């Protein structure tokens, strides 16, 4: 039979501590020095299409990842992410692209509605099929959102 001892065992009593912050920063500094390109030399560089600077890891891979262990097995107090307060951040280039597409589409809609022709240049042409395909006579477009909702509901009901 097994017996349960009173008090902490050797495994529980031993505590593992990680490196100090100074050790982590020193090691990180050493690794970052390895990633910096070497100073230019007087020799012409050889043509190597896949040459990598000397270092402990390839340039395409990310650098070392710092891992912070829990102190005494406790999690750090963190706030749960709230979806109500979060806003997506957009880059300036993204906003410019959205603005360009929006303005271009508004111009096309104005020209299709019979707005000013503008210098008599080419106008957008809306495609209208003159002889519809008889196979598409009873075609009903599908609402993908509704279809995915039905599939999701079917999976949920089949699992329970």
From Swiss-Prot:
Localization terms from the record: Cytoplasm, Stress granule; Nucleus
PTM annotation (Omega-N-methylarginine): residues: 35, 65
Pfam families (UniProt xref): FAM195 (PF14799)
Predominant location category: cytoplasm
Keywords for the protein's UniProt record, in alphabetical order: Acetylation, Cytoplasm, Methylation, Nucleus, Phosphoprotein
Domain of life of the organism encoding this protein: Eukaryota
Modified residues (Phosphoserine): 61, 82
Modification sites for N-acetylmethionine: 1
Ranges for region Disordered: 1-64
Known partners and oligomeric status: Interacts with DDX6. Interacts with MCRIP1.
UniProt similarity note: Belongs to the MCRIP family.
UniProt name for this protein: MAPK regulated corepressor interacting protein 2
UniProt source species: Homo sapiens
Gene that encodes the chain: MCRIP2
């Amino acid at each position: 039979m097994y017996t349960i001892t009173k008090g902490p065992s050797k495994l529980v009593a031993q505590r593992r501590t990680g490196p100090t912050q100074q050790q982590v920063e020193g090691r990180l500094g050493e690794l970052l020095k390895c990633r910096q390109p070497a100073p230019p030399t007087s020799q012409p560089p050889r043509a190597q299409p896949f040459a990598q600077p000397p270092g402990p890891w390839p340039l395409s891979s990310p650098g070392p990842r710092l891992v912070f262990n829990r102190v005494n097995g406790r999690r750090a107090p963190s706030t749960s992410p709230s979806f109500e307060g979060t806003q997506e951040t957009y880059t300036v280039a993204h906003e410019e692209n959205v603005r360009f597409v929006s303005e271009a589409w508004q111009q096309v809609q104005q020209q299709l509605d019979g707005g000013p022709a503008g210098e008599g240049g080419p106008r957008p042409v809306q495609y209208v099929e003159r002889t519809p395909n008889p196979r598409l006579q009873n075609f009903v477009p599908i609402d993908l959102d509704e279809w995915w909702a039905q599939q999701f509901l079917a999976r949920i009901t089949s699992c329970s």
